[in-house]
Amino acid sequence: ETQSLPEHLYGTAELASQFAATFHNAEWGKLLGMWHDLGKYSDEFQEYIKKNSGYEEGERLGKTDHTSAAAILAKETYPSLWPPIAYCIAGHHTGLHNFTHDSRVSGDLSDRLKKQDYLDKIRSKIPNELLEKINLNPPIGKPIDPKQMHLWIRMLFSCLVDADYLDTERFMNPESFEL
């Protein structure tokens, strides 16, 4: 039995929303959970998962990007609020990225935001209800200084990473799942 992608996205959204509600940001958690794996709708990712899961015979594939599409979608959908969304989603398996390009550092966010074709290839495959805009309020409703913003992004990131892991555990091993 496999967990469908929508089941995982909604399950992760439910948990991330619950975690982020503890600091009055449930809607941010919900959006992060719903969008964090949208890139898995790509043909490349579906091929990758089939080969790496043993579902299809053949050699194993290398890694494939499944986070850039949602980071780009965040910039399109939330022009003034996109950075926290993009940072959290782009880094949910690897850690938070740097923004500016540094040739000594791989995986920075600015490079991911240039991959418009990733989003273009999957946009029509994403169920419309996952693309519905959620009303997001700025953190704590007022401007915050960079240190506060940094902490807030890390809190959201933690909500997403924990929710992603726990939703997978809930599906794979329900008897051991607990919050």
Q: What is each PLM-predicted segment?
A:
Residues 1-179:
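Accessory nucleic-acid engagement/destabilization modules that flank
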